[in-house]
Curated annotation (Swiss-Prot):
This is Disulfide bond formation protein B. Keywords: Cell inner membrane, Cell membrane, Chaperone, Disulfide bond, Electron transport, Membrane, Oxidoreductase, Redox-active center, Transmembrane, Transmembrane helix, Transport. One of its GO terms (molecular function) is protein-disulfide reductase activity. InterPro entries: DiS_bond_form_DsbB/BdbC, Disulphide_bond_form_DsbB, DsbB, DsbB-like_sf. Signal peptide: none annotated. The keyword Cell membrane applies.
Length: 176
């Protein structure tokens, strides 16, 4: 399995599949926001940012998958997945254990050098409350689904990182 993951990480298709899945989740979030009129909260916006990090990792990895550029892509993939898990866990905790002392911020706080909420307010502007239950599917809220998705991303990313030293075997049918 590790040799297979190594081979996949050296091909462009797997990286583009990673980027496609993250983009599909982003488009789903925008559908929920603009078509179903669900209001995203601050933690939802941060989780979207983590998904954009996974998307960026897929694009960086697809640029030159056979070179050493895949290592920064794997690092970005692991970091974004970990942050997504951390944020989804915090959001799930706020939803499942409501408390007046555990709340999220009122406004998104991006770095001053990257004010995404000012540049793209249709995507990164938070208008909802983190403790409000807006959507559920199969008795799970959206942050719980994202917790599972980010955990799957992280598991696969760690396995791909572990697989990097395992080269695929050369198959020489006519040698001894």
């Amino acid at each position: 399995m590790l040799r297979f993951l190594n081979r996949c990480s050296r091909g462009r298709g797997a990286w583009l599949l990673l980027a496609f899945t993250a983009l599909a989740l982003e488009l789903t979030a925008l559908y929920f926001q603009h078509v179903m009129l669900l209001k995203p909260c601050v933690l939802c916006i941060y989780q979207r940012s983590a998904l954009w990090g996974v998307f960026a990792a897929g694009i960086v990895g697809a640029i030159a998958p056979s070179s050493l550029l895949r290592y920064p892509a794997i690092a970005l993939w692991i970091y974004s997945s970990y942050e997504g898990i951390r944020l989804a866990w915090k959001h799930t905790d706020i939803l499942l254990n409501p408390s007046p002392f555990t709340t999220c911020d009122f406004f998104v706080s991006f770095p001053s050098w990257l004010p995404l909420d000012k540049w793209l307010p249709a995507i990164f502007n938070a208008t909802g409350d983190c403790s409000e239950r807006q959507w559920s599917f199969l008795s799970m809220e959206m942050p719980q689904w994202l917790l599972g998705i980010f955990a799957a991303y992280l598991l696969i990313a760690v396995l791909v990182l572990i697989a990097q030293p395992f080269r695929s075997k050369r198959r020489d049918l006519f040698s001894r």
